[in-house]
């Protein structure tokens, strides 16, 4: 699994999310948490391009182990879920890496802003400055056909990224014939949903159960 952390595309580093890697490793999965460049060093779409490079690195290193058919899943929280979703629905990011959405077994998004307009809000406007077509940054507007299966998790009490992002994105994926499971956790907000992945918070909601069930269901996808 390649996990992309959140932070409004402005902050974060992989060290702060080691608890996620440890928790998912304890479930039996190999987890890679790459860093990516952030604003103000870069603007969109540079961080998505960095993420595509990270996935290419993962594939190259899987090949070195002699197990090139090992399934690869993308996952992310908040801004990281936005990045993972774009990689899965917009093939252009992978083209220079000789990969495509078909190389992924599935995508797990936690509290992702899949449908929002980044130019509407002062907090994100500069991150996406220079964007001629705002739909280019919306995963929900980049769905062109069949994508990998999606597991979309969201807290019903999320006051940072409204759960409507997940509901609307899921609907649009389904309209294009994609496999989607969406789960709203009534007891969770924007940050508790990622905390619920790890101890001692993993008993507040069955987030890990949903992740494990999804991976086990789709890990035999035959991706190479």
Please annotate each region the language model reported.
Residues 1-7:
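Short beta-strand element of the alpha/beta-hydrolase
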Residues 79, 113, 156-158, 187-189:
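Acidic beta-to-alpha connecting loop that harbors the catalytic carboxylate
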Residues 167, 175-224:
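C-terminal catalytic histidine-bearing segment of alpha/beta-hydrolase fold enzymes
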Residues 146, 152-154, 158:
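Short beta-strand/loop motif that positions the catalytic acidic residue
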Residues 53-122, 135:
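Primarily recognizes the serine-hydrolase "nucleophile elbow" in alpha/beta-hydrolase
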Residues 10-20, 164-165:
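The serine-hydrolase catalytic nucleophile loop
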